[in-house]
């Protein structure tokens, strides 16, 4: 395909136009006075959202240079969303301000490389102050405040705080669509996986259609079990111990399954068989998780263990197991806490080293099942459009709240950036174009607060000047127009979100400023539409 090339100022200005179109669309959503953006979909109902990354993803521009500029800023929003779960609009506004100031200085003759170095040093200094000013999240109320700001709804904030309080910071909080109105919270006790009993005959509670065993043994086998001959030795030992048995295996069928069912119906021996969760290597890993949680061993010929040689000490144990037709829950496994902690640390290391979003999500689920728990927030609404928007808002707020628990919180509303900047620039000593680069950051970090003020119908310059003189942590509550202690008023942001937004915006701004040429695909001319046969003829 033929290419078109732009150089110097033309190249940079083309990219900036694309950035501005995208940023101007996204920034109307910032702050309590921000509005929504409607996104048309080719199929189904349109989406209404105030989430920066969702809006950015939908924007496609015709001009090839503008398109590249917009794509670069999409990357800022996406990276911030991936790392922190929120702050996408703030990151976009910061990127726009940094690029605007930076290009003005490049056009005036400043050295782009020195500007980039100055920007990087200033961002590092501001980030250090932000992290230093962060306060640990100590109460459920603080989590609720953070989530409420992200979701724009105190009820959602309270539910998320309740969920995180119950499952802990390693736990998983998922959001599902509900058929009812309102928002509900469902908590899972213990480890749960999505495989149920292999036969209805295993049910012990007919009313609830569940198999419930107290103080049960658990056989964990990474193989298919078809012959009862393999199972009999361990079944006899469990019967002698007067216990019940949960069998988790690749599959249980044929003679083995039939014999277990007959013994259950006759009241000789209570057991239940379920398929192992997952596939391939993930199944092996999950079986090992279950073994460590329950203090058992995975029975597999790979490690030299045969079913007929299994003894009771190789079985896992749990205070309670509950099995339905769709899922299995293991409550209070008898595993060694040190081994569980070691497994948790191993999975956490795998999460840090994984490049795949899907793998990270699955590892996070495994981690939660071992270390915390699982909470499901069920979101309902009157229409499909409202339901999608509400679900998305809750998902963002959950990630925001988890980021707050992870690294702490700072004053919200753009206040933390301005006040961290004030402290950082007093200590920073740079010269020449590096000092100019630092000054670009000094100007740009005011942009989020200015935009919040504009969206709330206030004068941005006056607001920023006033906040700069206030004590640390005090700023504008844009919802009421009052100047307050932001943390006491419950207006806070996770420091991870604010830090990531600034760092990612600065990274893209540096690329913009040091660009000397842009190579883009030449737009193809649309093919002429063929006339319909017989058009314009009388018959």
Curated annotation (Swiss-Prot):
An example molecular function term from Gene Ontology annotations: unfolded protein binding
Keywords per UniProt: ATP-binding, Chaperone, Cytoplasm, Isomerase, Nucleotide-binding
PANTHER family: 60 KDA HEAT SHOCK PROTEIN, MITOCHONDRIAL
Domain of life: Bacteria
Protein name: Chaperonin GroEL
Disulfide bonds: none
Organism of provenance: Leifsonia xyli subsp. xyli (strain CTCB07)
Assembly: Forms a cylinder of 14 subunits composed of two heptameric rings stacked back-to-back. Interacts with the co-chaperonin GroES.
UniProt keyword Heme, yes or no: no
